Amino acid sequence: MGDITVVLGIGAAVLLISVIAVRVSIRLGLPSLLLYLGIGVLLGESVFGIKFDDADLTQSLGIAALVLILTEGGLTTRWHAVKTSLWLGVALSTVAVAVSVAVTGTALHFLLGLDWRMALLWGAVLSSTDAAAVFSVLRSLGVGARLTGALELESGLNDAPVYIAVVLLASADKISWTAPLLVLYELAAGALIGVLLGVFGAAALRRAALPATGLYPLATVAVCVIAYTAGDLVHASGFLAVYVAALALGNARLPHRADTLSFAEGLGWLAQIGLFVLLGLYASPSRLLDALVPALIAGVVLTFVARPLSVVLASLPFKVPWREQAFLSWSGLRGAVPIVFALIPLIQGVEGARDLVDAVFVLVIVLTAVQGSTLPFLARRLGLVNLHEAQEVQVDSSPLDELGAELLQVHIQRGSKLHGVYMTELRLPSGATVSLVVRSGKSFTPQPTTRLQVDDQLLIVTTEEARDAAERRIRAVDRAGRYARWKGETGD
């Protein structure tokens, strides 16, 4: 009992300090991920004396945390916000990765004297942008759906090809001519598994009459984790499978969707905190100083040569303006993922892999501090920040099983064209009606002359048959205003 009490006490204290660190990081203008790493380093052998050097366990826990982070990222990504950036995001996560690996690897082969295998391993590991870092920074900037969508898709999708590249390079003596076919199979099969489990999982959850609201978020996350394991079992990309499944589930008509997203967000934060503290605990400060020079050389090549060149080449077919290209080039945020991937060659006994781990750790600290703290400034200087960008209306549903009906909860956001619309202008389908409006903490039954306002919350009772049409109509008016056509403007 004594040991578990100490472990629980230390774990809870670290978690509480990490939560407080979020507030501190905002005040200091630094990414909170750096503070989590710092907490882990302080807990380590050099300060508080906790010795932890198990690379296998670190990698296993790191992959588990990454699965949860990708789950949260996929669930909270709105399809309509990223669909216009889909192919740009795919290009950044494939073409840009290949260019970055080639350019970085070639440069480090000559600059650091690394053999080709190790040089390309450096390039592959450093090419992965971190989903946790990107999600935590971008969503508060207000740089527009196109850029945010492209970067979120890139960070969610590029783990798969990078992981495959690292595994292949770490076992370079086993690579055959079938390697490109293997890569294509892993990506295609991973995406297919994600789509199938996401679609069928959403259908099952809609039909499940679970006895408690809190079970829906648990079931949703479980489906996403199953997608990862299913992909891994058939030697497909589990990372791609979990992200695609989460994306499909997050954009499906799920019961208690708001509760699910809140749960996923909390789980994502827990995974981020645990992962970065763990990696900080694993790091050896005495070795990091020796890795400083090669890490900085790699950082300069990656930041000022490989990343910009890869962005330019990947975005050529999409006619991306130079300002957006500059922002995309500076937004390749690194975090825990490169460190976790760097452990793969170390575990497989590749010569020089320990130096790679140390250099990547240093580079993550430097790039996160520099890029993460300057990204808001750069976005403003490039004129990409839109302070008045409209936010999507929030619609949640709760099943009313005994009545054969559902309750839609609608929250009118800033910039929504629902503002100023009269109740009669909503023109909801037959079987749906606004039963209550909550405004400034007070609720009332709306009249035909009631005019909607920003921050109003509407409770709409609808039959199961009219539910989809009611939500489409609400989203249509949210986007196009009172004159949104019943047919043609769906809001999707």
Residue ranges and their predicted role:
Residues L346, G383, L426-L428, R451-Q453, ...:
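Short, solvent-exposed amphipathic alpha-helical segments in soluble enzyme
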Residues T463-E464, D468-Y483:
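Surface-exposed interaction regions enriched in Ser/Thr/Asp/Glu
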Residues G38, A405-L407, A432:
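Sequence-level motif detector for i,i+2 pairs with an aromatic at +2
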Residues M1-H388, E392, D401-E402:
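Transmembrane helical cores of multi-pass secondary ion antiporters/exchangers
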Residues V300, L408-Q413:
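Short, glycine/charged-rich beta-strand-loop motifs at protein surfaces that mediate ligand recognition
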Residues M1, Q453, T490-D492:
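C-terminal end-of-chain micro-motif
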Residues L387-V410, R479-D492:
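Long, charged amphipathic helices and adjacent flexible linkers at domain junctions
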Residues R414, L418-E465, A470:
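Cytosolic Rossmann-like ligand/nucleotide-binding regulatory domains
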